[in-house]
Amino acid sequence: MDPNCSCATDGSCSCAGSCKCKQCKCTSCKKSCCSCCPVGCAKCSQGCICKEASDKCSCCA
């Protein structure tokens, strides 16, 4: 699997627990690789969903 977990916006992806991608914009991605999450957001691994056109996500807002 692509370690960068790249996919189209609003697409689906299955990021591994060790995923460290920074460009993942998948709505289905529930790992800390959501690009809208700040580094060190402890809640991101608990179900982060990036909001469209936003620099924050549902768990880090």
Swiss-Prot record:
Positions annotated to bind a divalent metal cation 5: C34, C36, C37, C50
Residues that bind a divalent metal cation 1: C5, C7, C21, C24
Residues modified as Phosphoserine: S58
Keyword Phosphoprotein: yes
Matches recorded under PROSITE patterns: METALLOTHIONEIN_VRT (PS00203)
GO biological process, one term: intracellular zinc ion homeostasis
Annotated region described as Alpha, given as residue ranges: 30-61
Alphabetical keyword list: Acetylation, Cadmium, Metal-binding, Metal-thiolate cluster, Phosphoprotein, Zinc
Positions of post-translational N-acetylmethionine modification: M1
Keyword DNA damage appears in the UniProt entry: no
A single GO molecular function term of this UniProt record: zinc ion binding
Residue numbers binding a divalent metal cation 2: C7, C13, C15, C26
Residue ranges, annotated region (Beta): 1-29
Record-listed a divalent metal cation 3 binding positions: C15, C19, C24, C29
Binding site for a divalent metal cation 7: C50, C57, C59, C60
Binding residue positions for a divalent metal cation 6: C37, C41, C44, C60
GO cellular component, one term: cytoplasm
Domain notes for this protein: Class I metallothioneins contain 2 metal-binding domains: four divalent ions are chelated within cluster A of the alpha domain and are coordinated via cysteinyl thiolate bridges to 11 cysteine ligands. Cluster B, the corresponding region within the beta domain, can ligate three divalent ions to 9 cysteines.
Family indicated by similarity: Belongs to the metallothionein superfamily. Type 1 family.
Job of this protein: Metallothioneins have a high content of cysteine residues that bind various heavy metals; these proteins are transcriptionally regulated by both heavy metals and glucocorticoids.
Protein name as it appears in the record: Metallothionein-2
Species, as recorded: Rattus norvegicus
Annotated gene: Mt2
